[in-house]
Structures are given as structure tokens and as C-alpha cells.
Amino acid sequence: MKSLVLLVALLLWSSSVPAYPSITVSPDEEQNLNHYIQVLENLVLSVPPKEPGREKKSNSPKHVYSIASKGSKFKELITHGDTSTENDVLTNPISEETTTFPTGDFTPEIGMKKHMESTPFWSIKPNNVSIVLHAEEPYIEKEEPEPEPEPTARQTEAPRTLPVVTESSTSPYVTSYKSPVTTSDRSTGIEISTESEDVPQLSGETAIEKSKELTFGKHPESWNNDDILKKILDINSQVQQALLSDTSNPAYREDIEASKEHLKRSLALAAAAEHKLETMYKSQLLSPGQTSNKIDDIETVINMLCNSRSKLYEYLDIKYVPPEMREEAATVFNTLKNMCRSRRVTALLKVY
């Protein structure tokens, strides 16, 4: 914008100067004019060329004066008489001294045409655009936005698992130890969770049904407490042997500590389950002809009746008894009826 104002000022100033046969130019004026001409040449040469296909034809009078005509006006302003092809000569009539200075060609150099996408200035959108001024009209050079990197999916940290311990020849039922929460069984596909430290109670699902899930493919009647303890000891020894080489690795330190805590809980649960299983085997698997300690039998029966006293009315109702146990339940019910009718039992009950 400043260059256009300067150009107009120079044109007006040149038209107001009277045309005399000779012009006296001082050194300061000559230096200023040379400076202005050099600035205008740089401005003209710095304007990028426009594509031929994008040029608009216009008959308006503002395009009559070309750059060459403007250059000739400046040449008339500072030259007189004959001009040389190489240099312009300024002659001072008083001292007859000549001053030469090179004149620049006002024809802009045509460089390599740069391929660009231009849009009208009225369709500018609020995005990354830059305005490039041409010699005659402005147009918009749109910069292609850089492709944004595709958002990467958030990677969720996978839970750490302990190294898989394969079974050895000495323990045919041990499969693997994967995490401090669950243990998987290969033959039955059962996962036993040890997060809860509650021991099976008498109400609801009995411990006999729980023990069937812990058999790992072995028949529940042949699976005893010694086998359970031996199984736990085998797992313990295999875990210790598998983790001996990884104790120095800090990446496995957290898993090793979690495994130790899990093993402690497993041993505690095994001891509690052993005690419960002993009690349940004595109370429910005791046959009439089996020899056992009488004190233990009495304690077992009384504890069982005491713990289930709130649900005795349901146990005595035949509709709550499973079909496969109704024959045994009928025998128990008849025995209880006969006991209630017996005078001996009635006399014993009066004592309490």
C-alpha cells in the first residue's frame, strides 16, 4: 500500500514540474531519485507472475498506463537530450559536468510459474489462508492444511499375569497357575475364585457339592483331605521353582509378592475347608453301621440341628426335599414321629 502511495506521489510531482529544455539536478535530488527508482524496481520485480488462465480482461481506463509508460515518465523527468543505450546522462548547463547513472529495465522478470490454487477474495473462509498481491488484482492463495495425525486408540494396560507353570509328572492333576485371583482347571474347565475368604456354611449349597467341584476330575468319594493338602504343597513347590530365576527382575517383583499373599490365603482356606469337611462328612456321610466316636457323633448331630433350627420346618416339608432323597427323608420323618410318640422320649424332653 505504501508503494502505491509513493508511486502516485511521484507521478503527480512529475506532472507539476514545468518542461524546460534543461533541468538542473542537485546531487541530493539525484541520490533520492535513484533510491526511489531502485525501490520501485524491487517492488515490481517482487510481484509474482499470475497464471495466464486466471487473468481477467478489463477495458477500464485504469489499465491504460502500463509499467513501461510509467517508467518513461520517470525517464523524461530525470533525462534530457540524447540518451545512451547504456547510461542516462544528466547535464548541468553551468558547469558542463555530466553525471551518469545506470537505468533499470522496468520489465519484470518472468520466473518459473508456481502452481497454486486461487479463490476469489469474497469466498474467504476463516481458515489458514494468505493474501498474495499481484500487479493488477489481489487473489487468495490457499495453503493446504497439514493432515492431522490420526488419533491413536487408548491402550489399556493389560493385567499382569504370572508365568504359566506347567504340570510335572509327579502331579497329574495340577495344570497351571495364572493369576493371584483365579486358578484354572484343564480337565473340567472350572475357575475357582479365592478372593472371598468365606468358608461354605451349612445353609444353602452344602460343602459336599463344593467338594465335588474341587476334585479336578477325580471321583469325590476317593478325594480326601490328604490329597488336597498334597495338591497345595505340589503347587507351592512348583511356584517356588518357577520363580527362582525371576526374583532379581524388578518387573516380576510385584507379581511374586501377590503370589505369596495368594498362597498364604490358599493355605488358610485349605485348613478351614479341611475342618469343615471333616464336620460335614461326620454329620451327613455317617452310616448306621459305621463305627465312630460317640462323643463326636453327638456333637456333630447337635451342632447340625442347632445351626439349622431356623429352617427345620422347611426340611421337614416333603415338597422341599429333592426327588432322589425323598426315600431317605421319609425314613427320617417316620423315625421322628415314632420318637415323639414314645413315652421315653417324652419323659426325656420334660427334663429339658
Curated annotation (Swiss-Prot):
Keywords: Cytoplasmic vesicle, Developmental protein, Glycoprotein, Signal
UniProt entry tagged with the keyword Glycoprotein: yes
InterPro entries referenced in this protein's UniProt entry, alphabetically: Equatorial_segment
Cellular compartment(s): Cytoplasmic vesicle, Secretory vesicle, Acrosome
Biased composition (Polar residues): 166-193
Signal peptide annotation: 1-19
Location of the region described as Disordered in the Swiss-Prot/TrEMBL record: 140-203
Pfam families the record matches: SPESP1 (PF15754)
Post-translational note: Glycosylated. In testis there are two predominant forms of 77- and 67-kDa and a form of 47-kDa, whereas in epididymal sperm from caput, corpus, and cauda there are two forms of 47- and 43-kDa. Testis forms contain complex carbohydrate residues. Epididymal sperm forms are N-glycosylated. Then undergoes significant glycosylation in the testis and that the majority of these glycoconjugates are removed by the time sperm reach the caput epididymis.
Known glycosylation sites: N128
Any one of the GO CC terms: intercellular bridge
Domain of life: Eukaryota
Record GO biological process: acrosome reaction; fertilization; fusion of sperm to egg plasma membrane involved in single fertilization; sperm-egg recognition
Purpose of the protein: Involved in fertilization ability of sperm.
Family of this protein: Belongs to the SPESP1 family.
PANTHER family with a match to the protein in the record: SPERM EQUATORIAL SEGMENT PROTEIN 1
Protein name as it appears in the record: Sperm equatorial segment protein 1
Provenance organism: Macaca fascicularis
